[in-house]
Amino acid sequence: MRAKGGTSRGQKPGSLEAHERLVAECLEELALMGFAAWENPRRAVQVNGRWVSLTKAGRGDIQVLLARQAEGRLFGIHGEVECKTGQSGQSPKQRAHMRMVRNSGGVYIVARDRNEMRAELELLGFAARLPAA
């Protein structure tokens, strides 16, 4: 587990702040598009002196409910956004989780900026539910 303000293995100083900024920008864009979305932070507790993760490895940084209209009914589709900055790529656990979400009918997007995320959602047929600001 990383201490607050620290960095994960392989991250350069300052990249944690860039990642947090990207997550905030993507959350803002999803809100502007009219979708319910929230950050999916890593959670851990200490048990007998050891840190134990409470979250699934590989999950996206953001969870979102994507609205889809079908046969006059509104459905919420599970979606996740994995935010990547710099040259970082997905870990094997993230790729496995992405496949699981997509194979279950959900949407999993890897985004390096808010515009890329919005474009990919629109390409998948999830247009903004609210007019663009």
Predicted feature residues:
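Catalytic phosphate/metal-binding cores of nucleic-acid and nucleotide-processing enzymes, i.e., regions
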Residues: 1-133
